[in-house]
Regions:
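Well-ordered secondary-structure scaffolds
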Residues: 2-273
Length: 273
């Protein structure tokens, strides 16, 4: 049994789909997050443990830790440890000890925030901002469509178009961005059925209205200080799909499968084998 771990940078909803799959497959995973995560689909994002101490996604519990020494105890309990380490300092520390099997950058910032191939024996970047063979070993496509989850061995993913993928036949209309600067005060909650024009939140004194009728699939954390134009909410036009607010998306599951495929093809086996 290997004592090496998979480090995943980022704990948003897509990253959490990957992390959940890795954990279920028997890999030891360590999540690294920033101090103030801005996940929208917070009911399926392990990064919420930064605020609450723990976060559960489809029956798997993530626990915030303050030191690497706590990892073993959390893994032993069948949970996933998360540390606030936006610079990735512990990657260097663990790699120097030979305890990192692979590094997955799942921040999905549309650009590389500091991941390089020399950080781990195997490096994987999700989405645009990475070039396979240059700053990471592999890139996994994150754009919805025919090439979703395609494993790229040379070059970058499809550039960010700024247009959200289709959900229920709706694209850009389903995503809501902040109309102003300030602290957000939510008037609706995840999984609420909302009507077009309904006030979902206030950013400072400015109201944020629902762009379409549907299920509020996600909304940024209450009290978050948002800039103009930041994504703050997501509406699913399919009212009957309320349960989807609490489960990993099809997109995340597809990407997760490709990450596992890369690991296995490179001989990185689960810790349980």
């Amino acid at each position: 049994m290997s004592d090496k771990c998979i480090i995943v940078r980022g704990g948003g909803d897509l990253a959490s789909g990957v992390i959940h799959r890795l954990h279920r497959c028997g890999y030891r995973v360590l999540i690294l997050e920033c101090e103030k995560p801005s996940a929208i689909r917070r009911k399926v994002a392990f990064c919420e443990a930064v605020y609450d101490g723990t976060a559960a996604v489809e029956g798997i519990l993530c626990r915030r830790i303050d030191s690497l020494e706590e990892c073993g105890q959390v893994w032993q309990a069948g949970e996933i440890p998360l540390m606030v380490d936006p610079a990735g300092n512990c990657i260097i520390e663990l790699s120097a000890q030979g305890k990192v099997a692979a590094l997955v950058d799942a921040i999905l910032a549309k650009r590389n925030l500091g991941t390089s191939r020399n950080m781990a024996p195997l490096t994987i970047g999700l989405g645009p901002g990475f070039s396979a063979g240059e700053d990471v070993d592999y890139v996994v496509e994150t754009m919805r469509g025919h090439d979703l989850a395609r494993i790229i061995t040379e070059g970058p993913a499809i550039p960010n178009t700024g247009v959200p993928g289709m959900v229920g036949g709706v694209s850009k209309e389903r995503v809501i961005h902040s109309p102003g600067v300030g602290r957000i005060h939510n008037m609706a909650h995840i999984a609420d059925i909302v009507e077009k024009g309904q006030i979902l939140a206030y950013v400072g004194e400015t109201s944020v209205e629902a762009s379409i009728t549907g299920v509020l699939r996600g909304i940024i954390k209450e009290g978050y200080n948002v800039p103009v134009g930041m994504k703050i909410a997501d509406i699913d036009p399919r009212k009957e799909e309320k349960k989807n607010c609490f489960t990993i998306s099809d997109k995340a599951r597809c990407i997760a499968g490709s990450v596992v495929e890369i690991l296995l093809s490179e001989g990185v086996l689960p810790n349980t084998l």
